[in-house]
Amino acid sequence: MGSEMCIRDSFYGGLAQIIAGLLEAKNRNTFGTVAFTSYGLFWLSFVAMKVLPALGLAPEPSTAAVGAYLIAWGVFTALLTAGTFKSPRTLQLVFITLTILFFLLSIGDLTGSTKIRVIGGLEGILCGSLAIYLAAADILNEVYEKKTLPV
């Protein structure tokens, strides 16, 4: 993991999502609070798993440990996915694809399969694209006070 990825993942993936989660708490949105703060902390912990060993402050985690960690996040995400079933279809798809992504990445780590890792990466692009579309739709629909992009 390069330094640019560590910076991006720590601040945009981690800190920004934690702040978003805290703002969702202010809005009394339990789902948004749990999802954003949890995934923000995921990114900070994932970066720490890569950075701390590089600094000599912790041992390098085994691929089995990383795989198990990703399985735990897959299970957590599957549980959150159940909370999206009364939400817009696009949000459901983001969480379904995120669940699949965590499991594919964990299988890739546990088996060492490059093919599964590549499939996981492609699936991650799909998940990220859906999330970007959802964010754009939320912003445009609010700004124009009408459904400009369906969700």
Q: Which functions belong to the PLM regions below?
A:
Residues 20-26, 32-35, 105-108, 134-138, ...:
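A structural feature that tracks compact, well-ordered secondary-structure segments
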Residues 9-17, 42, 65-76, 119:
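Hydrophobic alpha-helical transmembrane segments
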Residues 1-6:
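Short, small-residue-biased leader/transition segments that mark boundaries at the very start
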Residues 33, 37, 41-68:
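Helix-adjacent hinge/juxtasegments
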Residues 68-79, 89-110, 116-137:
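Alpha-helical membrane segments in multi-pass integral membrane proteins
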Residues 19-26, 45-59, 76-83:
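Membrane-helix exit/interface motif
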Residues 23-31, 82-93:
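Membrane-helix interface "capping/anchor" motifs
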Residues 141-151:
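Extramembrane terminal tails and long inter-domain/linker segments of multi-pass membrane proteins
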